[in-house]
Amino acid sequence: MITLQNLPWILLYTGFLAIFLSRLFSNGKQSRDEKANGCQPPARYPQWDPIMGLDLVYSQVSALKNNRYLEWLRDLHAKMPKTFSLNFFGQRWIYSIEPEILKAVYATNFRDFGVEPIRRHSKGSMPFADKGVNTTDGEDWEFSRLLIKPFFERNVYTDTDRIKVHADHFLSLIPADGETFDAQPLVQRWFLDLTTEFIFGESMGSLAHPERADIAWTMLDVLRGGRLRAQMHRFMWARDWTWWLKAVYKVHDYVNPYIRSTLKELAEREERIKQGLPVGPERTDLVWSMATHLRDEELLRSQLCLIIVPNNDTTSIFISNCLWHLARHPEVWKKLREEVFALGEETPLTFEILRNMKYLNGVLNETHRVIPNNVTQVRACVQDTVLPVGGGPDGKWPVQVRKGDIVSVTKTVMYRDPDYWGSDADEFRPERFDGLRGTWNFLPFGGGPRRCPAQMMSQTEAAYMLCRLARTYSRIEARDPEPYTAVMRIGPSNKTGVKIALYK
């Protein structure tokens, strides 16, 4: 008998039954399609909840909460072949560490995959942001790429003079020889000053005024909450997000005045031109460039927030991760200094010089490999397609992927796979990149049309900072005996920071 008391349970069981029958029908059709296309299914991850996959949902959220997400990913892959499928929130996910699958997702099958169903349709980023270069596909994505065109311009990413003034200030704040300090927040403030100048046309000045850096820590809360909301997906309603919403509105309060003043100045400039009156030189900062194409305040804020918040985290954490490893490998620091001093002490650190320093770039690449900012590459299948490998008992057969399936390439596991990197894959050894040609098993900034537009800028900024430190300090020491514990934001950062000491 149906009563008000048992109605919710009846609806719940009915929902599960509907999902089960739908999956049963879908699996039967997929099996027929696989045979017709010469495909075979990938190995199946064993789950005690094969219908909704709530066992993996719970374990993943728990891993994120306890700062064990990287270990969770490694454990997930440890006893499985390079490609396998599982069920997550009732959806088929294909996990892989196959370079050929990454190539298909990034390039050869690019139009068969997208990010919008995962990042935008889930509403996990709302009300922080909606449309942007990180959340859209198709024409919307192409428009967002147009808005951030300055990232691609050579005169911007090759300009090391814009880095120098902030690097000088950064170096002046490093404590005296042998004094322990946490480099991570200092690097964060340096990068905040550098990036706000590029985006807004004026630096925040957080190196001189540390209290201004509070917005950076707020941005980190936005990133942490955003990742957790994405993982919880359909169960976002089960958690109180008040703390996250406070962070979101604080970031909005920070960027809104810049947007409004820019739109006002742009309108006034256009009116003066219309009247034949003289105008000054046009601004060259990013928000000005974006505003010339997009005049809606809310839409512009969405696009801008999806640039400034993730961008503020990635490069600074990358440099911090470099320093964490260099402090534990004095022989690498010594070789880096030898390469830097071979240039001559007064040689300007230009873009061309930095990009041709083999060992320096080996250090950067090895840091990307051991602790990648982009831990996983996740794409939703937007139309039925076929992946080139991953199916069958030997993993060599093509795999049928249906619209709605999710493909996740786990870079943090791929980058440590001994099959690709040798028996010392877990070791930090920059020499491994000497003479190594680019392959699909190492793409720290992605590949294909969605390659990170800030790649050259980020690499130049990191290279410049490491060179300046190597020129100034003869020795670097680790002052934290704890192992690296990854706290997930956009990418991983060490829970206890980067406690080091430097000696001139």
Curated annotation (Swiss-Prot):
The keyword Metal-binding is assigned to this record: yes
Transmembrane parts of this sequence: 7-26
InterPro entries: Cyt_P450 (IPR001128), Cyt_P450_CS (IPR017972), Cyt_P450_E_CYP52_ascomycetes (IPR002974), Cyt_P450_E_CYP52_fungi (IPR047146), Cyt_P450_sf (IPR036396)
Gene3D superfamilies xrefs: Cytochrome P450
Membrane disposition: Single-pass membrane protein
Family recorded in the similarity comment: Belongs to the cytochrome P450 family.
Protein name: Cytochrome P450 monooxygenase iccC
Biological source species: Talaromyces variabilis
